[in-house]
Structures are given as C-alpha cells and as structure tokens.
Amino acid sequence: VLGATQKNDGNISGNGYIVTWAFGHLVGLAMPDAYGIENFRRENLPILPQSFQLIPRQVKTDKGYKPDSGTVKQLKIIKEVFDQCDKIIVATDAGREGELIFRYIYQYLECRKPFVRLWISSLTDKAIRDGLQNLKDGTMYDNLFRSAKARSEADWLIGINASQALSIAAGRGTYSLGRVQTPTLAMICSRYLENKNFVPQKYWQLKLQTGKDSIEFSALSEEKFDSQQPAIDKLQIIK
C-alpha cells in the first residue's frame, strides 16, 4: 500500500516511508528493585512510586530479571527510524492497549517528533488507503492513552503490593495476585467447589407437547421448581 518494499533488519523502507513494528509491549513499568526496593519486606509496603519508570520488557533468569535481547534490539531499530523521520504515523491497534504500546515506546525513547494516528479496524488494502487519507492528530487520543496508563499503573500497584503482602503473610513461598488473574482464579475455584460439594436434588419442570401440520414438537420450561405443587399451579395458569 505504501510502496515500501525494501526489507531491512527490523523495518521495511521505500517511497519515502520507513515501516517498523513492535511485538506486544516492548516497554513496561519497572519492578520495585528499580526504585531501590529489594526482597519482600513488610516495612516496604505499600510501594507507591512518586513517578513510574519505564524499562524494556524483561525476561526471568536464574539471576533475576534482565532486559529481553530481542526487545532491546527492536527498540534500537525504532529509535533509528524515529531519528530519520520528520513525522510518525502510528499504526498500532486501534484501541487502548495499542495506544499504550506506542506511547510507552515514544516516552521511553524520549522522542519529540510529531505523530499522527492511523485509526482503522480492517487490514484490507482499501481500509488502509482510506485511513491514510484520513489521518488523525495524535493528541486526539491523549485521553485514551491516559486511561491505558491508569490501567497499567493500577495493575502494577495492586499486583506488586498484594503479591508481596500475601507472600509475607504466608511466611514461605511466593504468591501472585492480580486485578484480573485473582478474580478469575476465584471464579474457577468457586465453580470447582460447587461441583465438588454438589448434592443431587429432585426438581420439576413443565413440558409442553404440541404440533401443527403433522409436525410435533415439545418445549421444556427454563424455570425449575423445588416441589411439585408450584409446578402444578403454573401449569394451571398456562392452561
């Protein structure tokens, strides 16, 4: 669509454009050790950074977390592209997380180049061409970014503090809590306990048998009755 056909390491160029990409969140919020807080100690809680630091995506190793080499390489390529361009066309997903992916990279690389937004929901050639003809000012999505940033920081505050608090209270092991994962796990556990403690009970339903033009069919009520009499009463109403 753009006419950029020259494939390079980490980008594609041509026709006045350089196209590069991110693979997920290349930049995220730093862990507590970046603020000088190491190990799980009760006196450190709650951990409330004055301002959050951005770092490249980390991977866990035997010696702790370290920057992912592929992420660091791609960020270097993106910075080189930013340095070469006059203006940035942001083409990340048209949504909150897509906006956050770009803005965190933009902030981490301390870029000051102006940017506009390609806002499309289809990846057909026509949709892309139409979107390029109707680029939006990047500032139009500042509030979308702020909402994504608030979600990201809230997840950090809840996850870090709750995980450390539970681990300290338990006295051994490391336990992970999160805004999404913990309620989801609670739903799974609740359902498991319901099934485990389930005791079969007798119930009644209404069944209707009817037909038309020699075609017979039956219908079963969604409502279930704990005893027979309420079912009979409802049946009389229907009749």
Predicted regions: what they are:
Residues 151-223:
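Prokaryote-biased recognition of long, low-complexity C-terminal linker/tail segments
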